[in-house]
């Protein structure tokens, strides 16, 4: 089993005035070896619990595809906190340890953040001595960067065009033996089942509203967000800053806000007045949810 090298990444969200220049930047680095060096922000600890795959319905026809899986983050999954989707503390956000970093082929430049996948070890594909029965459902919360210094079949597991899941260690060990390190898997998209409504965390400052969208059910992968303030009758589209952080340069301070969230399957849900008057930056609010 190859040695691990965890390399911290830096998230820089810079707000520049005038508002038209406001934008966010993120930088990522990765190490060598398999299943390691994921994009990661500084993290905090905690504990959470995932959901079983039997509660999830297939999406897009439910067909299975082939990939490989490794693991990272340690036995308590503390090393999976942060990540390129911007979710931060995966425990407090409700994602728990049922998470994975996706290779370029699956990550879709961040638009796959929040998508749910059912994954099972493929004993017939060469993992007969390492596989455990059953399957798990993981949420995409991070990016597994390519490592062009290593061959795709010997350490560069996330190199394009490979489909690869770098899973948290606890969830990997539910489908395969720890000593295996890497196993062939089958996977398919499934519907995400979440408790409560979609959550909107508003960061930034006046004229730079950075809205983190989490706990999204259904397809899970947010592709568009729009906001409507109490002083406007029109919806204003937000632009994706990074991960699932969406930004607006409008002056929204103190107003009641409604949000419209659209996922990759084209479905939308509206959370009317999810944010009440008098809100403050840094607060999180709950809205409607996909059925």
UniProtKB/Swiss-Prot annotation:
Induction: By gibberellin (GA3) and wounding. Residues 1-22 form the signal peptide. Residues 82-197 form the Expansin-like EG45 domain. GO terms for cellular component: extracellular region; membrane. It is a peripheral membrane protein. GO terms for biological process: plant-type cell wall loosening. Keywords: Cell wall, Cell wall biogenesis/degradation, Disulfide bond, Membrane, Secreted, Signal. May cause loosening and extension of plant cell walls by disrupting non-covalent bonding between cellulose microfibrils and matrix glucans. No enzymatic activity has been found. May be required for rapid internodal elongation in deepwater rice during submergence. Belongs to the expansin family. Expansin A subfamily. This is Expansin-A5. It comes from Oryza sativa subsp. japonica. The lineage of its organism: Eukaryota, Viridiplantae, Streptophyta, Embryophyta, Tracheophyta.
């Amino acid at each position: 089993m190859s040695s691990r090298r965890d390399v911290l990444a830096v998230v820089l969200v810079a707000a520049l005035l005038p508002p038209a220049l406001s934008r966010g930047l993120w930088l990522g680095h990765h190490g060598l070896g398999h299943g390691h060096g994921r994009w990661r922000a500084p993290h905090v600890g905690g504990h959470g619990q995932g959901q079983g795959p039997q509660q999830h319905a297939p999406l897009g026809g439910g067909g299975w595809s082939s990939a490989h899986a490794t693991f990272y983050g340690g036995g308590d999954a503390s090393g999976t906190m942060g990540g390129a989707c911007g979710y931060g503390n995966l425990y407090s956000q409700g994602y728990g340890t049922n998470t994975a970093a996706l290779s370029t082929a699956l990550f879709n430049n961040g638009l796959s953040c929040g998508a749910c996948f059912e994954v099972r070890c493929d004993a017939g594909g060469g993992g007969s001595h390492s596989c455990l029965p059953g399957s798990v459902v993981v949420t995409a919360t991070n990016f597994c960067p390519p490592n062009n210094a290593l061959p795709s079949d010997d350490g560069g597991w996330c190199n394009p065009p490979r489909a690869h899941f770098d899973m948290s260690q606890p969830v990997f060990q539910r489908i395969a033996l720890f000593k295996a390190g890497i196993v062939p898997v089958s996977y398919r998209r499934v519907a995400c089942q979440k408790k409560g409504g979609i959550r909107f965390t508003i960061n930034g400052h006046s004229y730079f509203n950075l809205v983190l969208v989490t706990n999204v059910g259904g397809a899970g992968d947010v592709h568009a967000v729009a906001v409507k303030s109490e002083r406007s009758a029109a919806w204003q589209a937000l632009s994706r800053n990074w991960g699932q952080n969406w930004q607006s340069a409008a002056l929204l301070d103190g107003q009641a806000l409604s949000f419209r969230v659209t996922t990759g399957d084209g479905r939308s849900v509206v959370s009317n007045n999810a944010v009440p008057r008098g809100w403050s930056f840094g607060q999180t609010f709950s809205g409607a949810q996909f059925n």
